[in-house]
């Protein structure tokens, strides 16, 4: 029991920082909203899911975390060693920014490649969609929806992102912190309910308008814009769709589905698994078994 309590306490600083940053985004959302009069009830449900994510994810990461350590020990400290110090030789004032700001952008760009395919699989593989659908059930998209995420998603990302990145790159703690910070802030930004069109930068860096299309249930937007930071991956792999001028569509699940209770949504992947386990066999195999009886 003490381990459980210690784990929850360890998440409190991250939760505090998260909600303070979300609060600042909320102020901006009130000033320049993309969607006016969002439901306070919906925003409250986002907050509940945020808390459940921060509380449950550390427990879900215990086994995957051990696998990351094992892979790192097996393959060493990364196959790719990036060193940009030569670019700033003799320019002391540029050395720190290059090492700690520019250098992490390289693995961040590659991480987005892995995220693109992870995200695409979440939409194409039914078993992965059962947990990811919670994120898309947000009918009022705002910064809080960034962590309206099922606790199962984080351990799954270990296999599609963390381990591949750990094998490829050797990054120090400072660079790793910058990467994590950048990803978190980008997540808040792209989900924010703010009317900030990027204009010519739209296909270069992901923004709220472009990501809003990904959350749209409209057929023309479905299964589009998977990248989290750099739309180039969607452009290269044929899943990019640009927003029309002034286009800020409604968001939510396709086919008019709506989210259920918090408890139901968190248990939903296991509900689906249980139903499949109880579903009678069908098809040729079932026919043969029926004939044998």
Where do the model's predicted regions map?
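Loop-to-helix transition at the N-terminal end of transmembrane alpha-helices
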Residues: 13, 17, 41-55
């Amino acid at each position: 029991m003490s381990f459980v309590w210690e784990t929850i306490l360890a998440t409190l600083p991250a939760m505090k920082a998260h909600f303070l940053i979300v609060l600042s985004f909320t102020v901006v959302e009130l000033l320049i909203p993309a969607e006016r009069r969002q439901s306070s009830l919906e925003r409250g449900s986002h907050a509940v899911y945020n808390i459940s994510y921060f509380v449950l994810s550390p427990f879900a990461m215990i086994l995957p975390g051990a696998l990351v350590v094992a892979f790192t020990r097996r393959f060493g400290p990364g196959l790719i060693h990036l060193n940009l110090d030569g670019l700033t030789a003799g320019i002391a004032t540029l050395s720190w920014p290059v090492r700690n700001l520019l250098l992490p952008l390289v693995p961040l760009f590659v991480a987005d490649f892995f995220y693109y395919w992870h995200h695409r699989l979440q939409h194409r593989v039914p078993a992965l969609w059962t947990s990811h659908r919670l994120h898309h059930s947000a009918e009022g998209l705002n910064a809080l929806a960034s962590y309206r995420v099922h606790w199962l998603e984080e351990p799954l990302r270990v296999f599609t992102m963390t381990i591949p990145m750990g094998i490829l790159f050797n990054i120090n703690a400072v660079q790793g912190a910058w990467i994590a910070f950048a990803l978190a802030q980008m997540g808040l930004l792209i989900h924010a309910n703010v009317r900030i069109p990027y204009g010519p930068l739209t296909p270069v860096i992901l923004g709220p308008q472009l990501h809003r299309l990904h959350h749209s249930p409209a057929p023309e937007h479905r299964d589009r814009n998977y990248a989290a930071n750099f739309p180039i991956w969607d452009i290269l792999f044929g899943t990019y769709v640009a927003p029309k001028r002034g286009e800020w569509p409604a968001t939510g699940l396709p086919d008019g589905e709506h989210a259920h209770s918090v408890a139901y949504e968190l248990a939903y992947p296991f509900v689906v698994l249980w139903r499949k386990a109880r579903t009678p066999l069908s098809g040729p195999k079932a026919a043969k078994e029926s004939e044998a009886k």
